[in-house]
């Protein structure tokens, strides 16, 4: 197979190429060891390889999260999803054989990239299956969402814009789903070119717990008091986190390629997982100390303007820590103040060259060795980092 990188329109090329350098092919797997989603043209199919995962370009595959160690069977658009009686599903797990139904609306809708293929059943048959089986999760290849009120059992909805869609979607049918808890909206045109604006009123989605959105369209998820997980990329409006959310239960925050300059306000949330990737304007992370009691996983990936990492020594409950970038850390002595840490990887330079603090961690990885280091990566512990990370 031929793997050709695809460059999304508007992406910061330096950051993207740095991410591509962390993609390797091993044992038939394509591993993305960066914290940035990348795209490849694989024998004519455009494939998204999510950050921190590995995929095998043969359709259904086991995807391993390189950060948490968790393994789940998912589909990332390599060839064809699992087909059962003409219906397509994005989970091949034998215990969840009806998980994540792919719904084409209208029947003529086609997935971007062409990897899912045409529907084997009509929209009406998809609606009937959802209601008969009381399905809770669906991914919609969307040109029209007007059918959603007829599927009240849905709790998790992923929306992918149909190929060639050049108009705004009407998201108001989502407001009539009584049990919606998780909503993911993929970037139009796979994020490769600018697409239609996304306009949605999150205040009309009571009970929403998880939101995943892309692009710089104005979102009011900050007014959702039940939000527990938030992933946002390309947000150019917020310079700090003071008005990020009104939710008192926000546990997981992932920001990618946003205009954030300071983490001021982050201490208001009981965050357990924070991922900061390619935030080129981010300069101050000192507010992380306000999350010391709850924070268990922290990823700082290519946020080049951050120079002061002294707040790390206050994060005594961390279990997973990833520090990637071109900055210099004075030393790694802060690791000794993290008794629960079981996973640490870094590519930043350690000024004093002493890597011995890594020896007390079950799993440690040095991605860029230096001549003045007193240990090489092969000398660092490589024990299993546990059963993976789960939000409490």
Task: Give the residues covered by each predicted segment.
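Intrinsically disordered, low-structural-confidence terminal and linker regions
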Residues: 3-9, 32-34
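Long, solvent-exposed N-terminal ectodomains/accessory regions
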Residues: 9-16, 22-24
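Concave beta-strand-loop units of leucine-rich repeat
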Residues: 30, 35-128, 134-147, 153-173, ...
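Conserved acidic
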Residues: 1, 20, 28-31, 78
